[in-house]
Amino acid sequence: MINLTPGKIYHHTDITKAFDGQNEGGMRKSNTTNTLHLISDHTKNSPYRDVFDGDRVYYCGMGQTGHQDINGTQNKTLNESNTNGVDVYLSEVFKKTYYTFRGRAKLINKPYQEEQLDKNGDTRNVWIFPLLLIDEHQPINKSELAKTLEKRIKKNNKLTADELLEKIKSKKGSRKPGKRPTRSNYFQRDENIILYSLLRAQGICELCDKPAPFLKPDGEGFLEVH
C-alpha cells in the first residue's frame, strides 16, 4: 500500500520516492512496490486526452505515434491488472512537478479502441481503459479545471477552422463530455469544439444575433460556448 493521501498534492520528488520507480512517463511501473502509477498530465500538449466522469476515468493508453498496442509495455500491465497482482494508482498534474494524488484505480470494463490523432496529426487507433477511482477524496478545485481548459485553448488558438474541424472529426468514438464533481458540477469540454464554434460565430452571438457584449483584453469579442 502506497502511503499517500488521496486528494493531497505532492511534489514530483515525493511521488517518485513513494512509488520507488520511474520518474517520468504517463504509465510508471515499479517492480519494487509492484505498482503501476498512471499520470494524467493536463499541462502538456500531448495527444493523450483522458476523460473524467464522476469517479470513472477513461484513460488513454501508451504510445504517442501510430496505432497503440494492447500488448505493448504498460498497456499490457494495465489490461491484466485485475489478475497480475499489480496495484494501480492514478495522479493528475495541473501544475508542473506537482501531482494531485487520486489513489487506487481499478479496471472495470474491457479496454476498447477509438480513432484519435497522434502527435504528428495522423489518425490512429488508441486504447481506452475504463477505470474506477476507489478511494474517496475532495472534489477538484473548479478554477484548476478552468485554467487547464484555457491553456489548451491558447495552444490551439492558431489553428484554422478546417484544422479544428479535422481534430473534432478524428474523435469518432469519443464519449460524451465527462462531468467532474467540484463545488458545482464541471463539464469537461473539448477546446477544439470551443475554438471552432468561436471562429464560426465571428463575434456574433448565434442565439440573439447580436455582437459580443464586451471585448477581452486581446481585443476579441467575448462569447460563451455551450
Q: What is the role of each PLM region?
A:
Residues E220-H226:
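Accessory, usually C-terminal, subdomains that scaffold auxiliary metal cofactors
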Residues T35, I128, F222:
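A residue-level signal for beta-strand positions that form part of recognition/binding surfaces
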Residues D87, R102-R104, I194:
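Conserved beta-strand residues within beta-sheet cores
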Residues M1-T100:
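Acidic, glycine-rich low-complexity segments with interspersed aromatic residues
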Residues N156-E220:
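Short, charged surface segments at domain edges that flank catalytic/cofactor-binding sites
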Residues H42, E92-F94, N109, A201, ...:
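Generic secondary-structure microfeatures
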Residues F94-I153:
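Compact mixed alphabeta submodule
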